[in-house]
Amino acid sequence: MNMIEALLSMRVLFLTQVFGIFLCFPGLTKAGHLHYHSSIEVVIPMKVTEKTRGMNLPNWISYSLKLGGQRYIIHMKIKNLFLTRHLPVFTYSDQDSLLEDYPFVQDDCYYQGYVEGDSESLVSLSSCFGGFHGLLEINNIVYEIMPKKFSRKFEHLVYKVDINKTESRGSSLMQDNITCQVELQKSGNPILKQSSFEDWWTHTKIVELVVVVDKTLYDHYGNYTVMLSDLYSVINIVDTIYEVIGIKILLVGVEVWNKKNLIVIDDVSKSLRLYCRWKASNFLHRLKHDVSHLFIYRHLRGLSGIGSTGGICDPKRSCAVVTFIDRTLNLRAIGVAHHLGHNLGMKHDEDICKCSYSKCIMHMDSPPIPKFSNCSYNYFWSYTVKNTRCLMENMYTKDIFDRTRCGNGVVEDKEQCDCGSLRNCTNDLCCMSNCTLSTGSSCAFGLCCKNCQFLPSGTLCRKRDNICDLPEWCNGTSHECPDDAYVEDGIPCGVSAYCYEKQCNDRNEHCRQIFGQNAKTASVHCYREINTKGDRFGHCGLQGPTYIKCKSNDALCGRIQCDNVVQIPNMKDHSTIHFALVKNVSCWGTDYHTGTSLTDIGDVKDGTECEQNHICINRHCVHISTLDSNCTPAFCNYRGICNNKHHCHCNFHWDPPNCMIRGHGGSVDSGLPPKTNKKKHFFYLLLLQLIILACLLSCLLWLLFNIKGSKRKPQVQPTPVKTKKVSKKVPSQKPSPVPSPSLPQLRMPSRSASPTSSIKSTN
């Protein structure tokens, strides 16, 4: 066997906006061991007892403290809307049994507020351990405050964050910057200012967050109570940061890996992939949530973490991994907020992105800045507001807060709706300020609610995304669209492709995505030769730092191998293209650097066919029967297709649940499509017949008119024309035979005949 290998390395600058929001690449940021604190002051917060201007509201407290020679008045109120009622905490026993507990959570020691005289200020503090700990932003200066240990005078240490140590580098491409600014301003979703951001929608969006603490972070704390308190403080700061853009962060559960890590945590991308997979198969069914973050205490090659971009409403991608090592409480919170921004569809800031600082929270350097840039607002508007249906649904989850209150923007017990503040309620035609529907209104929100009324039954509320997806329709009696349903795993979607997790994975299409439209999957010899080597170009996964060799039966489930590559693609972020010649067959593939932020495009996707009636799952070629299901084509009477909930989605003309009775299609999960109006169809059919009949009558009348007209015309006899006889002497000769005009002249084959002559004359 001849083998020729060529490594083609292409190094390019990683651009976070190459592929767009809907490709959902993970986002990474640099963490480093940066010392942001430039100065320390000792302050004593003094409680203000007199009611200052505008502070006559109940449940508000005020403190005065002196920073940098200037005294500031801080107004705060207790925050009680970021922890669920009866917060569950999961741990493990010595026998690896799952334990569920509901520890006491002190919920009256978390505050949010502002600094008097600074409308852009931000205050997020906690006082659960006898002093204030948290974040202050005053006049575009960020501080971290914490109690001074063993102080009897209520002294606190205030650290001023040195932002200059993270100054962004200037760009010489001024024209490109101007062009990009113009493009952003011309976009359909213009960049909006923070001051008017709250007016974009009526209701607040809620992100239900689950936090998992790995073994290293648990061991670092040692004290279980202090660890949970710090977690709550971090989420408190994150919630305060996101409240500016109309998002509430709700912590709905915590899991602590107190015995051992349940996944392998070595490189960044692999850890994220494994954690997302673990979360989807374990935690998702245990506790409903929108996004889950894994907090660890170890270095990630200079990164603060990694999060799946735009995965907020995808249960298999709504996750992130964040490191807490060598980071203060504020930096931990800002790191969580950064990667949550990726989950919400925000990309890394570029040089054109601006806020009140030189770098903003979504910058790749992960600066200690709690402000979003104009670009982040634009991404949030163009993606999150318009594409995150799950957040709209979670807004109205019942019984999730410690205290119910009309006016908090969340529909709770005994509330028909909640339009939030009085200002918002004046602009809401469906909901009144007392959390009841306005007169004549049937609903106030939801995908099946329009103009305060339920959409009619059969109205499409969620269209079909691809061949492996299924549509959903409103039922006419609810404001909610049915849960997203899709084609059952294992159902064929092509010649050699199967639906799996809502995607139709085909090898040829996979190669075209990497190497262009002419590419196709390579010979099986390429897979068996390369993927059984166990190197970075061919393997079946990683076990620590070692590549796993694919077994011969699993070779087609390792890394993708392609043929018929016409042009080498422009790979990103130091990716390498691999070429080999196996049995005179070209084999093209890629490697993957685990420290990059790009998705590994070279892995064979789960659900890809590897043999007849076999598919790849977790890099193993398994029989399709392993996808156990009670739903079969026979169960649906061969008149429908099974969905992911193992119910029949019937074809048109047949009704669920088993597609036996005549109807209009759909399923018990997705609702029923609109019914066909037989009277309307009959009318259209009758109209078509009348049009055809009218055309025939018109043609008949035209023929009759022409026939009568020809009979009425008089017969005119032609006048004979006198002609002179012309005599000409012609030498006598035998006349040539003239062919009959009624017979066709055939060209007869003749060996001596001229090519241009078909009849021969004789004298």
From Swiss-Prot:
Query: Can you give the residue ranges of the Disintegrin domain?
Result: 403-489
Q: Does the keyword Aminoacyl-tRNA synthetase apply?
A: no
Transmembrane ranges, per UniProt, are 685-705
Q: Which residues are glycosylated?
A: N164, N177, N223, N374, N424, N434, N475, N584
Which GO terms are recorded in the biological process aspect for this UniProt protein? proteolysis
Q: Which CDD domains match?
A: ZnMc_adamalysin_II_like
Q: What is its main location?
A: membrane
Sorted alphabetically, which SMART domains does this protein's record hold? ACR, DISIN
Q: Which PROSITE patterns match?
A: ADAM_MEPRO, DISINTEGRIN_1, DISINTEGRIN_2
Intrachain disulfide bonds: C313-C390, C353-C375, C355-C360, C461-C481, C631-C642, C636-C648, C650-C659
The way it spans or sits in the membrane comes to: Single-pass type I membrane protein
Keyword DNA-binding listed? The answer is no
| Residue segments, region Disordered | 712-763
Q: Which residues lie on this side of the membrane: Extracellular?
A: 201-684
- Biased composition (Polar residues) is annotated at 751-763
Propeptide residue ranges?
A: 32-200
- Give the EGF-like domain ranges: 631-660
Q: Which residues lie on this side of the membrane: Cytoplasmic?
A: 706-763
Where does it localize? Membrane
Using the record's annotation, list all stretches that form the Peptidase M12B domain. 205-396
Signal peptide, first to last residue: 1-31
Task: Give GO cellular component annotations, separated by semicolons.
Answer: external side of plasma membrane; sperm head plasma membrane
Q: Which UniProt keywords apply?
A: Disulfide bond, EGF-like domain, Glycoprotein, Membrane, Signal, Transmembrane, Transmembrane helix
Tell me the protein's name. Answer: Disintegrin and metalloproteinase domain-containing protein 29
Source organism of this protein record: Mus musculus (Mouse)
